[in-house]
């Protein structure tokens, strides 16, 4: 199990990393393929973030999946915790973990709202281009800068 800590949260995941590459892992209940609204394939995994002071309070998740030939990130925040900076805090911590613990070089995001786009941009993702299947959506890309 991997653990990530931020100033307000603890994130936990059963992701599997072998030789720097993400492998299939146990996925949290409730993760859906948002484009076809069907249960995920099992190649997905996520970090669930909980309140440090109330470990039963689930705040948000950052998910990762291999789809459309790309490693994609998805995320969501529980309603009571929205617009309080939790998602950006979790995504920044996840990106640091991802860069440190994998040898992957590119991570893709496909935001579904202005708020999601804003979070990706604040975390260093750059606009890439329109989504091939729906030109009303756009790809954003995060390139790892390793030292």
Region spans (language model):
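GNAT-family acyltransferases
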Residues: 1-80, 92-115, 126-147
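Glycine-rich acyl-CoA binding loop
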Residues: 83-88
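Conserved active-site tyrosine of GNAT-family acetyltransferases
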Residues: 120
């Amino acid at each position: 199990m991997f653990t990530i800590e931020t100033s307000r949260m603890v994130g936990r995941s059963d992701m599997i990393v072998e030789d720097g590459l993400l492998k299939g892992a146990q996925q949290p209940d409730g993760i859906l393929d948002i484009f076809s609204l069907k249960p995920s394939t099992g190649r997905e995994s996520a970090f669930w973030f909980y309140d440090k002071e109330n470990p039963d309070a689930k705040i948000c998740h950052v998910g990762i999946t291999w789809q459309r030939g790309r490693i994609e990130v998805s995320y969501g925040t529980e309603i009571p915790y929205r617009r309080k900076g939790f998602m950006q805090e979790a995504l920044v911590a996840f990106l640091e973990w991802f860069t440190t613990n994998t040898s992957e070089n590119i991570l893709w995001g496909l935001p579904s709202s202005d708020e999601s786009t804003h979070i990706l941009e604040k975390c260093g993702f750059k606009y890439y281009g329109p989504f091939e299947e729906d030109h009303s959506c756009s790809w954003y890309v995060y390139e790892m800068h390793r030292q």
